[in-house]
Structure formats: structure tokens, C-alpha cells
Amino acid sequence: AVSIPVIAAGGIADGSGMAAAFMLGAEGIQMGTRFVASKESIVHENYKNQIIKAKDIDSVVTGMSTGHPVRSLRNQMTREYLKLEKENADFMELEKLTLGSLRKAVQDGDTVNGTLMAGQIAGLIRREQTCREIIEETVQQAQECIAAQGQHKKI
């Protein structure tokens, strides 16, 4: 057994995900996409709105052919990237397409040509909340889930 704390990450958007991670032995969790869509997040409002509007099937992984996979929301840029990957485009052609694409999304709010990095849980996010609200709601939900399972773990 591992004697260091395990932090679960990926696919966690709410208290049920937190509770599941704890029930599997994690000592803590990390949520990425959930906080990208928070009120305090510095990403452009257009980016946040795309996450909030996303459905559970709206993310895609690009970069598998380069060894640098990135999950992001589907848009024109990801469609073009996947097309080029399917055609076995070389690394430099793929790099050229994505050069500056994260900045386009985060700073400029370009939801067509920017990389809208987001996990599969984007479809679970329905509104913009403060970080405090996200944490309090997540912990409360986790406590309820764990209590319903008859486990007593302090969160």
C-alpha cells in the first residue's frame, strides 16, 4: 500500500465524484474544469460560457499522434486538427494550427479557433459560481453521499 496521500484528479465535478474518490482511498481531490468556469477564473467569459453550455459528448482529445494529448471542447480548430491527424499530417503542420490557440481562447475569447481545454465533466457544469460556492456545494454533496453509504469520513 502507498504511504503517501493520494490526490484524485480527472472526471470530478461535484460531491458524488469527490465521495467516489474518497471511497476508493483518495485523501483529496483536484478539480480543473470546474474552477475554469468559476467567477474568479481569469479566462474569457466566452470560454466559460462554452463550458457551461457543453453537453457530456462535447469534448474531444487531440494530439494523440504527437504524444501530447489534450482534451478540449469541440470547435472548428479541433475538427481541423483531427482531420489533419487522420491524414497523418506532420508535427510541424499540427503545431502551426495550434500555435497561440490557448491564448486565443483564454484571453481573446475566440471559441472557434482557440483551444477550449476542458474535461469530460464540462457537461455537468450548468452555471458560473464562486470558488467558495463550488467548494461548499461539493463538500456538502460528498458528505451526503458518504453518509448515505453508511461511511463516516470527515471531509
Residue ranges and their predicted role:
Residues 1-7, 13-155:
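Conserved active-site-proximal phosphate/metal-binding subdomains
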